[in-house]
From Swiss-Prot:
NCBIfam families xref list: purM
Pathway: Purine metabolism; IMP biosynthesis via de novo pathway; 5-amino-1-(5-phospho-D-ribosyl)imidazole from N(2)-formyl-N(1)-(5-phospho-D-ribosyl)glycinamide: step 2/2
Keyword terms, alphabetized: ATP-binding, Cytoplasm, Ligase, Nucleotide-binding, Purine biosynthesis
Recorded family membership: Belongs to the AIR synthase family.
Annotated protein name in UniProt: Phosphoribosylformylglycinamidine cyclo-ligase
Encoding gene (name): purM
GO BP annotations, alphabetical order: 'de novo' IMP biosynthetic process; adenine biosynthetic process
């Protein structure tokens, strides 16, 4: 055993991991991908995209303490989807097509089988998003993390024609707001979720509940974050949307106002969509107020589109063609005085 191994770092486990993930990484290749796994830097050829005035849009994010749920359940094959989703959905909100992705995994001990499961999830997220996994880093840090602990973060870059870049100046008065259904909690609010489940109560994650269709609580909580690229990017390319909001930490209350200018207000009808059972369960179990819920969770809406009234039917048709569940949840109007930028009825 080398002195480095005695110190807790096994470089041979790193080599083993690279061999295990090669197939998954290769499966994400797309137009513009160059090079192979193992290079010092990931490369991508922008010239093949034939974009006249390219604007690069980048995003970086992690999965937060949802990772602790995955580690508690010893289920690591979907958490990578969450990591990709958190990055590429943010990029999509600016109208950009995600091109490539890089991941960063930090752990107390490099277990090649476990890390390969995580990377398999990252690769699945990349395939869903049409983005290439062009690089990554696995850092073994025995004094920083416990043996079975790990953290996961990602970085992605996308591109958009300058004329199609979505900013808060695009949405207009009388725009219709379309909410796209979430798959569950997604990747935000898990510190509160864990407080409710494990500190305020002693919930067994393997318990199956009728309101969850027979799924266990753990399965519902770990449901991967939706990736909206396939259904929304075509709308952007056809100039059918004026704005996009990715509903993450802070829920609708914090994220929707980021989409439009300060002279507008979003009027939201909370009865216009079905709140997912997991949120009703957490609200009751945690004795949460309505404000607590809407300021923390997505409440069943993972993304919101601002659409001109004359383009509404075209958007609805294209979303339906993609089997996207959506709801008309409100509209934008002129803001009166110092009222809030979002009003939920």
């Amino acid at each position: 055993m080398s002195r480095y191994q005695e110190a807790g770092v096994d470089i041979h486990a790193g080599y083993e991991l690279v061999n295990k993930i090669k197939k998954d990484v290769k499966s994400t290749r797309r137009v513009g991908t160059t090079g192979n796994i193992g290079s010092f830097g990931g490369t991508f050829d922008l010239s093949v995209l034939n974009i006249k005035e390219p604007v690069l849009v980048s995003g970086t994010d992690g999965v937060g303490t949802k990772l602790l749920i995955a580690q508690k359940m010893d289920k690591h094959d979907t958490i990578g989807i969450d990591c990709v989703a958190m990055c590429v959905n943010d990029i999509l909100a600016q109208g950009a097509e995600p091109l490539y992705f890089l991941d960063y995994i930090a752990t107390g001990k490099n277990d090649p089988d476990k890390i390969a499961q995580i990377v398999a999830g990252v690769a699945e997220g990349c395939r869903q998003a049409g983005t290439a996994l062009i690089g990554g880093e696995t850092a073994e840090m025995p004094d920083m993390y416990a043996k079975d602990e790990y953290d996961l973060a990602g970085f992605s870059s996308g591109v958009v024609e300058k004329s199609k870049l979505l900013t808060d100046a695009n949405p207009q008065e009388n725009d219709i707001l379309i909410g796209l259904a979430s798959s569950g909690i997604h990747s935000n609010g898990f510190s509160l979720v864990r407080q409710i489940l494990f500190k305020d109560n002693k919930i067994d994650l393997s318990e199956k509940r009728e309101e969850f269709g027979g799924k266990t609580i753990g399965e519902v909580i770990l449901e991967p974050t939706r990736i909206y690229i396939d259904s929304v990017l075509p709308l952007v390319k056809e100039n059918l949307v004026n704005g996009i909001a990715h509903i993450t930490g802070g829920g609708l209350i914090e994220n929707l106002p980021r989409m439009f200018a300060d002279d507008l207000t979003a009027e939201i009808d909370a009865s216009s969509w079905k709140v997912l059972p997991i949120f009703e369960y957490l609200k009751k179990l945690g004795n949460l107020s309505q404000d607590d819920c809407y300021e923390t969770f997505n409440m069943g809406i993972g993304m919101v589109l601002a659409v001109s009234e004359d383009k509404l039917e075209s958007v609805k048709k294209l979303l339906s063609d993609k089997d996207e569940d959506f709801y008309i949840i409100g509209n934008l109007r002129k803001r009166k005085g110092n009222e809030e930028k979002i009003i939920v009825h």
